[in-house]
């Protein structure tokens, strides 16, 4: 059986042809601009198999975003520490992803729940070209612990299938992007379930797609491994997208190669 490997193909392409660049963290990267990956979500759940991805962290982070939360306290209650490097002493991160998704400030003083608005359009006007959620709030970026890397996503319905395209302005290919692929694939499954649709494609579009210089050996190790079949996602029935719990999300037949550790560039 042929296994599609969009992520590994992009990783190899950047490793072999990327341009050396400096970066905000001072680590150094090799980078390409404007790359894309496509996954057919009906063919399997795109949780990478060439290294183990910590799916518990992926799922809890998405549930945390959907809560509209900006404090790592809830993540800590569930044993997830992936945001610790950027949080304040009190655990605050400012108006990051979840706040913008669920409570974008309007000029009137009210707040816009972009997730609910997107779901409403999927149900009532699925051919709309305006089913968009943005985390890139220019007026609040300075208050965010980290400006959004995965900044903007759009939903598209055709033949009863829901597809999602993400634009990621800054893509740490080795550490960050495997999480992002799984997270938005999971979100697409949730949105499809709530709108009575099947899943279509997840399309990832990257701006600055980079491999940090101190990740190169880990990348070479990952690319030396044979890919395995993708797992299957099972999602419990819930009346609202905001009611899902971690126990409602099950990944079956996930058989990855071992995890590969690498330092985070902060």
UniProtKB/Swiss-Prot annotation:
An example molecular function term from Gene Ontology annotations: thymidylate synthase activity
UniProt subcellular location: Cytoplasm
One Pfam entry name: Thymidylat_synt
Entry-linked InterPro entries: Thymidate_synth/dCMP_Mease, Thymidate_synth/dCMP_Mease_dom, Thymidate_synth/dCMP_Mease_sf, Thymidylate_synthase, Thymidylate_synthase_AS
Coiled coil (UniProt feature): none
CC annotations in GO: cytosol
Residue numbers binding dUMP: 24, 129-130, 169-172, 180, 210-212
Active site: residue positions: 149
EC number per UniProt: 2.1.1.45
The UniProt record lists the keyword Membrane: no
Known catalytic reactions: dUMP + (6R)-5,10-methylene-5,6,7,8-tetrahydrofolate = 7,8-dihydrofolate + dTMP
Top enzyme class: transferase
Taxonomic superkingdom: Bacteria
NCBIfam families in the cross-refs: PRK01827.1-3, PRK01827.1-5, thym_sym
Family: Belongs to the thymidylate synthase family. Bacterial-type ThyA subfamily.
Other remarks on this protein: Mutations within this gene have been associated with resistance to p-aminosalicylic acid (PAS) in some PAS-resistant M.tuberculosis clinical isolates and spontaneous mutants. It seems that functional ThyA is required for M.tuberculosis to be sensitive to PAS.
Entries under HAMAP family matching the protein: Thymidy_synth_bact (MF_00008)
Protein name: Thymidylate synthase ThyA
Organism per entry: Mycobacterium tuberculosis (strain ATCC 25618 / H37Rv)
């Amino acid at each position: 059986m042929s296994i599609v490997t969009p992520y590994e193909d992009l990783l190899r392409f950047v490793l072999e042809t990327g341009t050396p660049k400096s970066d905000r963290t001072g680590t150094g990267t090799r980078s390409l601009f404007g790359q894309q990956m496509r996954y057919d979500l009906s063919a399997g759940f795109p949780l990478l198999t060439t290294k183990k991805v910590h799916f518990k962290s992926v799922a809890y982070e998405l549930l945390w975003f959907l809560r509209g939360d900006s404090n790592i306290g809830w993540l800590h209650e569930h044993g997830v520490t992936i945001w610790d490097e950027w949080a304040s002493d009190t655990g605050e991160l400012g108006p990051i992803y979840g706040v913008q998704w669920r409570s974008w400030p309007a000029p009137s003083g009210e707040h816009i729940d972009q997730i609910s608005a997107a779901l409403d359009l999927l149900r009532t006007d699925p051919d709309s070209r305006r089913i968009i959620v943005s985390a890139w709030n220019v007026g609040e970026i300075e208050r965010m612990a980290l400006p959004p890397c995965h900044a903007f996503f759009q939903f598209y319905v055709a033949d009863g299938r829901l597809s999602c395209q993400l634009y990621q302005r800054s893509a740490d290919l080795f550490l960050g992007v495997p999480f992002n692929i799984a997270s938005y694939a999971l979100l697409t499954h949730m949105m499809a379930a709530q709108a009575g649709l099947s899943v279509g494609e997840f399309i990832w579009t990257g701006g600055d797609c980079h491999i940090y210089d101190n990740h190169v050996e880990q990348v070479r190790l990952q690319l030396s491994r044979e890919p395995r079949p993708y797992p299957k996602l099972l999602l419990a029935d819930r009346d609202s997208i905001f009611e899902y719990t971690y126990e409602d999300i099950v990944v079956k037949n996930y058989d990855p190669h071992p995890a590969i550790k690498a330092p985070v560039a902060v």
